Every structure is written in structure tokens, then in C-alpha cells.
Amino acid sequence: GRRGPVRGADLRYDMEITLEKAYHGKASEITIDVAATCDTCDGSGAEPGTKVRTCNLCGGSGKMRAQQGFFVVERTCPNCHGSGQVIENPCRTCRGEGRVDKQQTLSVDIPPGVDNGTRIRLSGKGEAGPKGSPPGDLYIFLHMARHRIFERDGTTLITRCPISITTAALGGELEIPGLDGKRHKISIPAGIQSGKQLRQRGAGMPVLQGR
């Protein structure tokens, strides 16, 4: 039978985002260089107004078979390079490739709660396939920028707060700016020791949904 179309290559893009952006979620634009479908020939690789013909060597299957002993060896047709078609008049813009290098600006929807290594897939935004075949996908890998106040452990946010000896001995209250824009008040018990952890429920990172 006829060989199925060869997809374009998948692409990877590494993106650094702030902890604030990971907390709130936000659409961000990226610009990438990618092999995109040629607009002149609409990806066919043939000069507009001309036709492609079925490869006469493989009969349009894109594959060649040869008997080697007890085995049948299948390989890509050397005449049409697996496409099953031969272009007699190549497109002058893309030189018969069906794709050209372009710079594209894409919008990436970043959901709240993403973390280091979170992968976002943009279907069909990878390289265009050869001769008008389907494109690959674009995978965005997220990396968290270092934050001036918080360290992150999963959905937990950690910060270190210096307090006076008097506050440690007598107790008091501490205000910490949250990523939600609010100032969170934390009660410090009297006699607290250095290194003691205090927890503020609900003030950490949101849970990433649907992943």
C-alpha cells in the first residue's frame, strides 16, 4: 500500500518564567525559527500551475522491496525519497522542499501552578512536514527563575525571616508579602528557637490542574 505521510519534526523550546507568572498563570509570546509550509506552493513543492506525477519506480508506494535469501527487505524509494511522487517543476521559492525557514511568534498559555520541567505541548506548531505532509508538535519546557524572597518545594513556598531577640523571647507578629498580592500575618509564639518552621495554610502555590 501507499506509505503514510512523514510528519514534520517535533521541536523543543526552553522558557524561563518568574515565580509570579507560575503562580497566576499567564499567556506569553515566544518567537521561534521554524521550517514552515511554503506559501507559494502551499507545501506541495511544485511550481504553482504545474503537477506532480506518481513515481514510476515504486508505483507511488514510496517503498522498494527486494528479496534477500528468505527475507524481504523494504527500503525507501531512492527516486521519490518515500513520498510516492516526483516533482518535475520544483517551486522556485522553496526549491521543491515544500517548506521554508520562517520566524514565527506564538502565544503560550501558561496555567497556574506550573513548576520546573513542566511541559506544554503546542500541537501542529513544530516543523512543517515535507511536501505538504502534517507538521510536528512544539514542546515548551518551563524553568523557574530564582526568586528574591521564596524558595519552592512543590506547592510549598519557603522563606527565611530574621526577627529580633525581643520578638523571639516575647512573641509577636510578622508580615510576609504573598504572591497573591496580599500581606500575610504570621503569629510568632514566645520563646521561639532559631530555625523553627511556621506554616501559613493556603499561602503556597496553586495545584496544577489536569496534569
Where would I find each of the regions flagged by the language model?
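Charged, often glycine-enriched C-terminal and inter-domain segments
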Residues: 3-27, 70, 85-93, 97-211
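Cys/His-rich short segments
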Residues: 31-106
